[in-house]
Amino acid sequence: MMKINNLPRLIRAFLPATLLMLPLVWQTPALAQSASCTQGSTCVSVGGNNDPMSKEQARQSQQQWDETNRLRNKMNNRVEKDFDKNDRAVDAKDNCERSDNLNAYWEPNTQRCLDRLSGRKINP
């Protein structure tokens, strides 16, 4: 029978060995799972996955992401351009309405400041 005062010494002796073995025990189920990973199932693998099918899927995924990103950038640029256009039109309307020129009026369809007498564009 083991004495109780030897228990802390045994714990100090086996604890480092147990901690070193824990990662090996942790990895064993992961290695077993990777062997049974099939097409269409959700599997996560770390390391060298060099089969051509996964490379093709990664390439297609990257290509789709690039196209989506390009379209998103085009849409953002268009929205920004429209916003800037409307912002300039509001500023031009304010300038036209505050103009000292009594013949200046704002044409909402063309978003320009025009002369009442000639119909030509003016810069107030």
Curated annotation (Swiss-Prot):
NCBIfam families linked to this entry: PRK13659.1
The keyword Signal is assigned to this record: yes
Name of the protein in question: UPF0482 protein YPK_1977
Residues annotated as signal peptide: 1-32
HAMAP family xrefs: UPF0482 (MF_01581)
Family: Belongs to the UPF0482 family.
Sorted UniProt keywords: Signal
Region of interest: Disordered: 47-69
UniProt cross-references to InterPro entries, sorted A to Z: DUF1283
Tagged with keyword Transferase: no
Organism taxonomic ancestry: Bacteria, Pseudomonadati, Pseudomonadota, Gammaproteobacteria, Enterobacterales
